[in-house]
Amino acid sequence: MDHSDVEAEPTTIYPGHAILYQHNSSLPVMYRSLFVFLLIAVSACSMDNPTEDQVVAFPQGEIVDMSYAYNDQTVYWPTAPGFDKNTDFEGFTPAGFWYTAYTVTTAEHGGTHLDAPIHFSEGKHAADEIPLERLMGPAVVVDVGEQAAADRDHLISIDDIMAHEHEHGAIAAGSILLFRTGFGQYWPDREAYMGTAERGQDAVSLLHFPGIHPEAAQWLVDNRDINAVGIDTPSIDYGQSTMFESHQILFGDNIPAFENVANLDRLPETGATVIALPMKIEGGSGGPLRMVGILPTQ
């Protein structure tokens, strides 16, 4: 159906507040509904006493799936149990209709997942306590692919971040800061992606992949007001880390992290929007994450 001749209408959330609903949006109806729902939820939390009409524009553009599927190839930390899917029922019932049901088990930290601040910082947000507005926002992508290709133990530095800002401007408050190392190209080859395909505690010392330098993590806490960080490797700390200092620093400031991010090569350095919604595990240190990017329109 062609809606090109239909004007945009405001959808009222409550008196004095509206969202602009664009009928000729390029997004499918289900995604338009999702964005309206999310904006209502965020607005209800952040705007207690609106005094005048406001129009909120939600992102329009191509949707990029930034999560890997869970299956027997999913990459987990060497000491974590993997993904398991058991069939409870699959087939036609005695009544004649088709029915499927499965029981799945997974560690919190495997595949594309959330690291909640409580994972490395006592008393900070658990998975179910992270404010939703911290899990969505404008995406800033710092590309360190060249450095990571030259050294798979590359520590992402303040200089790497400053080089990005020199070209694209300062990282804005509320951004989702994503580091693109290029390691996503190796998924799900554990040896290429992690540095080893071995499992167990002894395999941890064999891990080799890039991560955030603790000095860069501290600089971000001190100088930028970001919502979250993410990376296309198994951890925001590099593979050879033994103290996981970048986790400690960022999580100490209640900044959550997204690990094993997929399709980061699809996002531009600036202009995209990210929504990253984890499984709501009460008291959880993390959990499976469904993450999407919305590319800017041309």
Give short role names for the model-derived ranges.
Residues L39-S46:
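Hydrophobic h-region of N-terminal signal peptides that target proteins for export
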Residues Y31-F37:
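Sec-dependent signal peptide recognition
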Residues A8-E9, G61:
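Bimodal feature
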Residues I19-Y21, S25-S26:
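Short, positively charged and aromatic/hydrophobic N-terminal segments
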Residues S46-Q298:
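Active-/binding-site microenvironments in catalytic and ligand-binding cores
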